[in-house]
From Swiss-Prot:
<dbReference type="Pfam" id="PF01445">
    <property type="entry name" value="SH"/>
</dbReference>
<feature type="topological domain" description="Intravirion">
    <location>
        <begin position="30"/>
        <end position="57"/>
    </location>
</feature>
<dbReference type="GO" id="GO:0020002">
    <property type="term" value="C:host cell plasma membrane"/>
</dbReference>
<comment type="similarity">
    <text>Belongs to the rubulavirus small hydrophobic protein family.</text>
</comment>
<dbReference type="GO" id="GO:0016020">
    <property type="term" value="C:membrane"/>
</dbReference>
<keyword id="KW-1100">Inhibition of host NF-kappa-B by virus</keyword>
<keyword id="KW-0946">Virion</keyword>
<keyword id="KW-1043">Host membrane</keyword>
<keyword id="KW-0812">Transmembrane</keyword>
<protein>
    <recommendedName>
        <fullName>Small hydrophobic protein</fullName>
    </recommendedName>
</protein>
<dbReference type="InterPro" id="IPR001477">
    <property type="entry name" value="SH"/>
</dbReference>
<keyword id="KW-0945">Host-virus interaction</keyword>
<keyword id="KW-1032">Host cell membrane</keyword>
<comment type="function">
    <text>Plays a role in the inhibition of the host NF-kappa-B pathway. This inhibition occurs at the receptor level, by preventing the signaling of TNFR1 as well as IL-1R and TLR3.</text>
</comment>
<keyword id="KW-1133">Transmembrane helix</keyword>
<comment type="subunit">
    <text>Interacts with host TNFRSF1A, RIPK1 and IRAK1; these interactions interfere with host NF-kappa-B activation at the level of receptor complexes. Interacts with host protein UBQLN4.</text>
</comment>
<dbReference type="GO" id="GO:0085034">
    <property type="term" value="P:symbiont-mediated suppression of host NF-kappaB cascade"/>
</dbReference>
Length: 57
């Protein structure tokens, strides 16, 4: 019976490694997305304020 069941320790280690990789991947992507979003928001805000100023004159 124990031959069919995979050893617990390597499976556990693999799961921990997988979760670490996923967490790191998600963290990197969210950081990049946040930075780009902030940059884009600043750009849009700047262009929008300039546009509204041009039209108010």
């Amino acid at each position: 019976m124990p031959a069919i069941q995979p050893p617990l320790y390597p499976t556990f280690l693999l799961l921990i490694l997988l979760s670490l990789i996923i967490t790191l991947y998600v963290w990197i992507i969210s950081t990049i997305t946040y930075k780009t979003a902030v940059r884009h928001a600043a750009l849009h805000q700047r262009s929008f304020s300039r546009w509204s100023l041009d039209h108010s004159l």
